């Protein structure tokens, strides 16, 4: 299917088959499609509404074209979310990666610079002193040595360069805003994945089921966070061995007090890192609590905790005893040694 035909179909409201979407995505990712065609197609697709089949096909093409990170670990975990919730809160998903690694998970943390908040995973890790420009073998070595590696998206998804211009110029969310967490270059089958809109909670879980993931928690909070919130209830779609279950969780069920989002907001990567370090030093406040509840879910997703309750309790202890802080420091050293 050529780009003009695909644009015609989606603007008429017709869903593409997986085979058709695969052809279109290959043209976008290999530079065959023009910027105008890319923009027109993405907008048409958004107005129609992306289907699970279309998202699955697009993710498969991106995975195929990515620079792979090969690690001999069947239970790799990723905590990458979509970003884009405009909350300007500390980078919870990054903090969770180190708590989960301290709890025995092997973590391939996929991430990038900021989408719409003050800082993304890459910004925070750079502020901590980590090198971001590692190649696939160096990332794999960090995972082997310290249990966590950072997969900086531009290093692994070079084919994305063809879509960057149109996406930036359009300035609206498109299919690509949800593809990042679906295209981990290490193929992590376990995930805690926050999405920027509740509309995506179940479709993303269904997409990951089609892609072969094992245990995933897709989350969106009522207060808008693409994390499990301590300021509101959170909607969860749990994928576990092919079955998807929806439920809601609250901070109270884990014995945590509610907090205002303003208690978690930061203006720079350095401020985000400072809040993370406070939590990693065992200082119990809103930052500690939101990291604990999300890291607990990550431990459960990685099958390192039998229940969410056990995961949250375990994550809190890893924060209190300094294990998460030591893991962060070991990771930063590893990025500078490999």
UniProtKB/Swiss-Prot annotation:
Alphabetical list of Pfam families matching this protein: Glycos_trans_3N, Glycos_transf_3
UniProt entry keywords in alphabetical sequence: Amino-acid biosynthesis, Aromatic amino acid biosynthesis, Glycosyltransferase, Magnesium, Metal-binding, Transferase, Tryptophan biosynthesis
TM ranges: none
Encoding gene, per UniProt annotation: trpD
InterPro entries reported in the protein's UniProt record: Anthranilate_Pribosyl_Tfrase, Glycosyl_Trfase_fam3, Glycosyl_Trfase_fam3_N_dom, Glycosyl_Trfase_fam3_N_dom_sf, Nuc_phospho_transferase
Organism in which the protein naturally occurs: Alkalilimnicola ehrlichii (strain ATCC BAA-1101 / DSM 17681 / MLHE-1)
GO cellular component: cytosol
Function: Catalyzes the transfer of the phosphoribosyl group of 5-phosphorylribose-1-pyrophosphate (PRPP) to anthranilate to yield N-(5'-phosphoribosyl)-anthranilate (PRA).
Family stated for the protein in its record: Belongs to the anthranilate phosphoribosyltransferase family.
Protein name (database record): Anthranilate phosphoribosyltransferase
Annotated positions binding Mg(2+) 1: 93, 227
EC number from the UniProt entry: 2.4.2.18
